[in-house]
From Swiss-Prot:
This is Histidine--tRNA ligase. GO terms for biological process: histidyl-tRNA aminoacylation. The lineage of its organism: Bacteria, Bacillati, Mycoplasmatota, Mycoplasmoidales, Mycoplasmoidaceae. It is found in: Cytoplasm. InterPro entries: aa-tRNA-synth_II, aa-tRNA-synth_II/BPL/LPL, Anticodon-bd, Anticodon-bd_dom_sf, His-tRNA-ligase, HisRS-like_core, HisRS/HisZ. GO terms for cellular component: cytoplasm. Its EC number is 6.1.1.21. NCBIfam families: hisS (TIGR00442). Its main location: cytoplasm. Homodimer. It holds the Pfam family tRNA-synt_His. PROSITE patterns: AA_TRNA_LIGASE_II.
Amino acid sequence: MVIKKPRGTYDLFGEEIEVFNKINDVLKTISNTYNCHEIKTPIFEHKELYIRNIGESSDIVTKEFYDFKDKSDRELALRPENTVGVIRSVVENKLLYTNPFPLKFYYLGPMFRYERPQSGRNRQFYQFGIEFIGVKNILNEIEGILFALDILKKLNITNWKLKVNYIGSIETREKWINSLKKYFNKYKDELSEDSKNRIEKNPLRILDDKVDGSKSFVKSCPKIEEFLTKEEKEESDNFIKCLKTIVNEFEFDSTLVRGLDYYSGPVFEIVSQSNKLTGQSTIIGGGRYTKLTKELGDNDYICFGFALGMERLMLAYRDENQFLSNNSVDVYIASIGSVESELVAMNFANQLRNLNYRVEVNFDLKKIDKQFKNSNKYNPKIILIYGDEDHKNKQVTLKNQKTLENKVIKLNELNNKIKEFFESDK
């Protein structure tokens, strides 16, 4: 029986991994410009870490966990997201006492959620994210939103919409949630079974439900701004005012909530309008969060972060950009001589690779016409032809694939001639 990959996973190779690596390089470059430092945390953590900090009623905890017990009967879980893992690492390693504020980190790695696979959504998925820890000014949070927008700009992704909301403190949100419970109980019969179960557990999830969220009575539900304190209203107004001076266009969406319990204050989502992202259109999302550092054993610090799914970002990138695969080599070496000649050809390859040229060498085909035919698979800029006669005369034939011109070069001049060729070809 053939063993295949598990449902909701995928193999990454060929052109897709080239796109992945291109985006990864852009993300790392932008992270550096924002003075963000890379952090890596374990792929699995203690299950309690997520239950306490994501929220027992969240979909992740109730439906999507990949959890297990190890041989010592400890309850562990594959990470479904990485914010709490980063905060756990920061607190455990006392990084809050050895770094200037705000601490700025970025991460990229696999996450795991047991959910129905669809376009841009898998059970194992790659997530990039940033965390600003110890934020003291709302402008740092706007800077985080600009970071997200810069990613799209650098990747030439233009078909998107920025949505923002202000959801107040955790205490304010509790008042809002209690009001939503009473409100949605009046419409219980018009809700799906999932939403009925959410009324008491987490009615905020009804607002972004793919079916119920679009119903008129859901859109008319109580809004968070009705429960904000005077200070929160002032901060919300200031957030919008500052954002307007920096971002050309965005939508204030009073129904926007994030899926995890630790969020408070300003939140945002960037929604792709690409046709390739059917069913899942949010490509970047995040906002302010508090209580996590305190919950994990330190003082309470205001933090801000966002995350994006690489798979969704790749789909959005592909929709607007033509990707030219880099499957060509710089130099193809056609070795058509004896073993002694082949060893010299191998030495050519090693010398050129040490100079950072991309090289393919073929030892199997002994007829030059077959070597030329085979070289077409690699689209080389130069072909080096080396056989027994060349070995005897200490020379090699260089074929320029652009002009189809052949030149006979002495072996001791080869590296310089190759260098001259690529410098003139820039």
